[in-house]
Amino acid sequence: MKALDLFCGAGGAAMGLHRAGFEVHGVDLAPQPHYPFTFHRGDAMEWLLDGYDFIWASPPCQAYSASTLALRRAGKEYVDLLAPVRTRLRACGTPYVIENVVGAPMRGHTVLCGTMFGLRLLRHRLFETSFPICSLLPPCQHKGDEIPVYGHGTPSWHRGRYDRNYSVGEKCVAMGGSIG
């Protein structure tokens, strides 16, 4: 089975799709030299969706992220592709998941955290699916030794709790060996 990973970045979601048995194809505007599977440089909003059994989309989150709130309040605008992505995916008929940050206007979403799955990853994300998912998920297990993973380093408002920025390697281990 083939999965399409839109806005793939370095491949964090791709690794999970691979572990679930999919042949993964990632699409991103930016070069991703470390993407672990088949990579296509292109516009996720224009990429053909035919021929895939499952589609994962992680559109840019800056329009909703807590880490950009001060900049947004100061007037900075970020691209918001969430609604157009949802429209495209609904129209194509292929099962899909859209992933984004807490604060994004997701529909019927589920909140997942790395600690729910035995990882040291403190990272809450929202998941909107085209299919029902089990609501019998384990609760978050925040014990105090989790590593927060954000887009580009640990935000200053979060560093007080963790005392430092964690290395890419430490974040990779916390995420179960994948980067994204």
Model-found features: residue ranges?
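Class I S-adenosyl-L-methionine
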Residues: 6, 28, 41-54, 61-180
